[in-house]
Every structure is written in C-alpha cells, then in structure tokens.
Amino acid sequence: MSCLTYAQAEELTEATSNNVLPTIKLEAQGNWLEDTNAEKVQKHAGARTIITRNRLDEVAATSIKDALKQVPGVQVQENNGTGGSDVSLNIGVRGLASRLSPRSTVLLDGVPLSFAPYGQPQLSLAPVSLGNIESVDVVRGAGSVRFGPQNVGGIINFTTRAIPQEFAGNVSLTTEYASGTDQVKYSPNLFVGGTLDNGLGLALLYSGTKGDGYREANNKTDIDDVMLKTAYQITDADAIALNLHHYEGYGEMPEGLTAEKYAQNPYQSNKSRNYFSGRRSDVSFRYTHQDEKNNFELLTYYIDSFRTSDLETDVSTTTSRMDTSPRDYKVFAIEPRWSRAYQLGNSNSEFTIGYRYLDEDSSEFSGRSSTYALNAPVTEIKARTTSEGGTKAHAIYVDNRFDLGNWVITPGLRFESIETHNNFTAYNQGVAVNTVSPKIDSDEFLPSLSVMYKATDNWNIFANAGVSFGPQQYNQLARLEGGIAQSTTDGLHPEKSNNYEIGTKYLGNGLNAELTAFYLDFKKELILERDAQNNGIWTDLGATSHKGLEVGLAYDFAYLTDALEGLKLYSNYTFTKAVAEAGDFKDKDLPFYSRHAANVGLGYKVNQWSVNADMFAQSKQHSPGSGDTYQTDESADGKLGDIPGYSTFAVRTAYDFGEQFYGLKIAGGVKNVFDKQYFTRSTDSTGGKYVG
C-alpha cells in the first residue's frame, strides 16, 4: 500500500494542458532536451515520449521505475542481483540488456548519470530521485547524432524541477507499506525557490528514501539526494545557470534464492552482509544565448563519484567468502553547441553544430577473502585485481533541418574519436602477479537521416535511420583468467547497430497518440557471463536483431462531452522480438526481456477528489544460460529457466483540500490489489530467484 501527504504553496502548470500547437515562426530550436513539451515531441521525427510531473501524480508513481513503465518500448527489471537495491536502476529499451541500464544515454538536466559515460556507463548507482523530477523525456529514435556514445537504447533525460518566477515551495511524504512482511519505506521531499527582482533565481531540491523493502531482512535503503539550482538572466538574450548536486545512497541487497528456498519462503534473506553504497557530487554550468535566429549553449560539468559493495557467496554448505569492489571515477566535459535558423526559399530551416570534449579517469579495486565458516567473522580481504583506466574523447556533430512545405528532412553526422586505456593488474593473495596495459583508439562516423511528413496540423508521419555506437568499456579491455591478467582487445570490439524507425503521431482534440515500428540490427553484440570462479567475463554474443511495435495513447474524454470532464485514459503497448542471429541460440530470444508489455489506466477527477486505476502486464522472459542448451526448465540454483509473465492492478484516490488549507493534499492507494506474486532471476554473483 502507498499513501501520500503533502503541503504545497504553488502548483506548476503543465505546459501542454491545452494540446494546442502554436504558429510556426523562424526561430532556432537549439537544445532538443530544453523546455520539453508535447509540441517538441510532435515535431521530433522519431519515437519520443515525455512523462510530466502531473502525469506522474495521476498514475501514482512512487519511484523512477514506476515512471519509466509509462513509456512504450521501455522495460524495467525488478531489483535483483548486484542491481538489487533502490540505489541502482535496471532498464532495457527494445529488448536490450536491462541490468544496470548499459545501452542508453541517461542524463539529468543534460549531464550524464553514469559513473563514466565511455568506460563505465552502468547505473549500479543511479543518482536520481523521483521527488526532484519535473519530467522524463525518452528519445528512442533519431537522437544518436546529438547524444552519445551509448545511444542504441535511446536517450533518457530527467529534468529537475524548474526555478519558479515567484517564491514557491512544498513538502511531501510518501509512505509505502509491504503487507507481506510489514516493512515500511518513506520518501520525504522538499522544494523551495523563487526569482529575485534582480533576476537571480534560486531553488533547493531534496528527495530521499528511507526504510525497508518487501524482503524479510537485509533490504534497508537510505538515500539522500539534494540539489541547489541557480540561474541569472543577464540580458533578454543571455542567461547563465549553475547547479550543485550531491547524492548518497546505501542499499542492502537480499540474495537470490535457490528453487528450494524460494518454495519454502520467497521473502527470506539470509545474507546480512550484502550491501551497495555510493556517492556522487557534480557541478554543472550552462551559458545560453538566444536571439531571433541564433541559439548558442555552452555546457560544462565535473563529476566525482564513488561506489563500493560487499557480496558474500556460499562456497559450500559450510563455508562462505566475501568479495568487495570499491571504485572511484572522475569526469570533466565541455559541450558547446550553436544552432542558426535561416530561410531557404519559402521554407524555414535550421543548422546545428556541436562539440564535446570529455576526460574521465577510473580507479577500481577487487578484493576477496579466504573462505570462512558460515556466519563467522569475515577473514582478511586481499587484492585480486586493480584497474587504473582513462578515456579522452572528442565528439563533433552537425545536422540540418530542412522544412520543405509539409516535409521536414534532417540529415546529420556524428564523429567520435576515443582513446581508452586500462592498466590492469592481477594478484595472488594480495601479491601482484602481472600487469597488462591494453589501449584502444576508436574513430567512428555515425550518420543519420530523419524524414517527417506533416499530414495536418495535428498529424504527422515519420521515418528515420541511423548508426549507434558503444565503445569498449574498461572491464572489456582486460580480464582475470586462470589467475593471470590478460588483454581482450584482440577478441572483443566496440558495438555498432543500424537502427530504423517508421511511425506516426497525433496531437490534438484531447488525443495524444503515437505508433512506431522499429528495427535494430547488431552485427556483433557483447554479453556479460560468469566463469567457474564467478568472474565477470565479456564475450561475443554475435549478431542480434531487435524488431517490434510501440503504441502510446492518452485521451481526455472532456473533448467528447462535458459530462465526461475529468475522465482521462492513458495506455501503452510494446511488442518486441529480440533474438540471436548466430551461434547455438540462433533465432532464440535474448535473455531478460518480454515480447509483450502493456500498461493501461483511467483517471477521474471531480471537484477536489481524484481516483486512478491502472493495470500493468508483461509476458514471460527467459534466462537460458550460456551453455550448449537453451535452458527453459528451472535450475536448482534458481538462476536459469523461464520466468512467467504476470499482471498487476493498482488503485489510488486523492483529495485536494485547496488553498484554504495551504495546498494540502492527501492520497492513498494499493499497488498490487490482488497480491499477485511474481519473480525474476539473476545470473550474477548473488543470483537466483527474486520475488517481485
């Protein structure tokens, strides 16, 4: 059960509430991710969805995962394995791997969320909290020119709450209660800000998560996420903004269960020492200039992040061992971009050129104890591997939007030049054995072309094609094999994918609808597997293909008749077929995605009351392993075998007391009305079955 209480001094109005497209004028659009609204989505010649704060309130989202389930093509995995806490984020787009979200460019106000965008793009630490978010913008197609490098899974940008013109503030508290284990989790949120007469704007944002999940033990979460936003309007055309952001997260990680233990009690957890923690501090500065024809932006940022984990593994029925993995990362980048609108004959067009320089450093340690008796004190941790890596990357991109009557044609080209190195050392009981120093240089041209036909003021048809690129990460340059450090640059390679879309969108008369067919073609894709010593080993999965259909729909019934004012429908459905095109598993489904996923909901608001009901469903998934046989039957350790599909129902009601009670609102709901029990699996070092 989930309930929400908060007091609010001022409500921010949703920019798209009227669903009206303004008159087109000659003006440079500039940053695609700035001031996102329904109009920008409609003009984008690719699959794109924006979830606003109002929509998040309507669907009673209590987490980033809940928010992303509203987006067609996006599948969210429940907490599991080493991504088994609320500190991490596991999302997969169009059948791509979801563990720690490795194949999408995920941003917060345009700044990368991952530890290191090139060398360590995973989100085992996902420094973003729902309470600080104004909107979620998911660009699934036609975005690879502007953003990278990991963009085959699209671009996901979380926009934080804007600095208001007038002083405003609110506080809120969300409480989640797990009926199966009587566990309680709290999420306090604070927002206060305004703009002074001299044009200086300030805002303080805080969002936290405290308490326990739904497992019986070892699932405590403690998250603090704070941001100070400043902005100053220098002139009518020039503005600067400075954001300071700090995130700290601690999450205990219940282990995966064997099939036998899961049958006994799926909520049990017997590994009290497993946890993940991390912190991130980042600062970003942005200068913008916008006049009648020009839009210039300079963004620079610095990120300092740290993460560590302790993972206990049973070696036998009587002994265990401990693995620990502290890691440090530092990132600096500068990104100038200039757009200019111009007329070509009777048509409006826009040229954009942008550049990014990014420098990142990583320092990683992996240690392991000797074996010890179950529940005995942990023995001394000794080094197994160390890694000192770094990347210097230059990216330049150009695109040009040609408005030719009802046609909009945008060719573009991105060039990535990347130098990555990693000094990787193997140890035996803390004594250095050998060091390898692999390096890889990548120079990649990534072309794209998008075409849109404006059939009416409200309806358009689009198609696009582009090339996406994923550079080799630090842990893909070297590995531990037989106790020896070995370079893998001869056996592995960067990933490339050819991406295609065709679709249509409609916005107007209360209806917001999108339909997209997609196809992703990997010549070679990499996959993370485990060896007998539980080391993570990157190998070639080979050629894969991802194809499918996405549907999104939202409708305001007030446009039908006044009698239905306040009634709204929202839904999405995705069909995905992601299969191997080579190897022993040719034509078989890739691991951990559902061919079918759907979400449908109704919201009704009358006077001060609002009621929402929604259903989420997904079809079965597979965890086939990496042997010679595609395994569908459950293994004894719970890691392998099919995962049944499931559906859940949720209801929520809320009451707005109005301004006479200082904007107080109270809401309550049930997320899983029929108490449906479902599970997922994990194949990593703490793998097994995980109850949902």
For every predicted segment, state its role.
Residues 173, 190, 286-313, 454, ...:
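Membrane-embedded beta-barrel scaffold of Gram-negative outer-membrane proteins
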Residues 248-252, 256-264, 359-369, 373-375, ...:
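Surface-exposed extracellular loop regions of Gram-negative outer-membrane beta-barrel proteins
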Residues 111-140:
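Short acidic/polar hinge/loop motifs at secondary-structure boundaries
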Residues 8, 99, 193-195, 327, ...:
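Conserved C-terminal beta-signal and adjacent last beta-strands/turns
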Residues 233, 239-245, 277-427, 514, ...:
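Face-selective signature of the C-terminal outer-membrane beta-barrel domain
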